């Protein structure tokens, strides 16, 4: 005998709501020397609450999964500085402006049933980024590499809990894509209807996932630096681990 029926794939959540943000900005602007010299300073703090997350563990009496819930908070704060000078020499006008901004990002709350949220996975790599309370948003997690074993050519991972075993408990924050600060400069010049603008910008302190030195691409080459700097013989003081196509997770490095 057969029966037909239906059931919801997940429990409903009538309390689900929009994420909200609260922000404060404090600033000072100064202009001197007939507006030729100007200076700006700002402090900002933004708190985003009730981030919508998935993967909440349901009660044992519930037989299906839970719907997305408001279960995460993030805080961003930092300073912004700007200094500029503008002047003219007869028909020639020019200006120079520089700026620098800092950013501190931190997950301040995550639902108590979640230790961390994993990002999407990549083929041959696995999970690369995590969302976890007390860390920058989507930080990089892995083993901290302290060097290359001169006898075996294998990377040496730091034993974070000093138990003599390298395992999941030794994984830690090894990087973040969020920069410590960003900066920029702009130069302008104008003369009798002609003008020129030159600008540049950059960032400092952000980490980049170095997936280009993975050895799982069996039909692709690697960069010359990794080939020349790899361990080859016992006693080598190498910068990179030995080549080993059967074990390609060592490119997930923190050094």
Give a label for each model feature.
Residues 1-38, 66-89, 176-182:
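Outer-membrane beta-barrel signature, preferentially recognizing the C-terminal barrel domain
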Residues 2-9, 44-71, 104-178, 186, ...:
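Surface-exposed, extracytoplasmic segments of Gram-negative outer-membrane nutrient-acquisition systems
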Residues 24-32, 37-45, 79-87, 94-102, ...:
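Membrane-embedded beta-strands that build the outer-membrane beta-barrel scaffold
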């Amino acid at each position: 005998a057969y029966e037909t029926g239906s059931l919801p794939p997940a429990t409903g959540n009538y309390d689900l709501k929009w994420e909200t943000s609260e922000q404060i900005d404090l600033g000072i602007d100064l202009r001197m020397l007939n507006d030729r010299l100007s200076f700006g300073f700002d402090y900002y703090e933004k708190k985003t609450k009730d981030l919508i997350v998935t993967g909440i563990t349901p009660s044992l009496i519930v037989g299906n999964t839970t719907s997305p819930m408001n279960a995460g908070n993030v805080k961003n704060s930092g300073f912004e500085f700007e200094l500029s000078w503008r002047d003219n020499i007869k028909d020639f006008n020019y200006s120079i402006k520089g700026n620098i901004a800092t950013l501190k990002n931190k997950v301040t709350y995550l639902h108590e049933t979640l230790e961390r949220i994993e990002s999407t996975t990549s083929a041959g790599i696995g999970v690369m980024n995590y969302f976890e309370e007390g860390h920058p948003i989507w930080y990089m997690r892995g083993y901290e590499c302290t060097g290359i074993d001169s006898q075996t050519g294998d990377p040496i991972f730091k034993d974070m809990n000093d138990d003599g075993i390298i395992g999941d408990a030794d994984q830690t924050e090894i990087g973040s894509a969020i920069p410590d600060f960003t900066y920029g400069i702009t130069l302008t010049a104008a003369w009798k209807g002609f003008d020129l603008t030159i600008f540049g910008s950059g960032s400092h302190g952000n980490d980049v996932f170095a997936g280009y030195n993975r050895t799982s691409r069996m039909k692709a080459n690697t960069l010359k630096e990794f080939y020349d700097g790899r361990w080859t013989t016992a006693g080598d003081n190498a910068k990179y681990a030995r080549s080993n196509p059967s074990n390609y997770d060592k490119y997930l490095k923190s050094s």
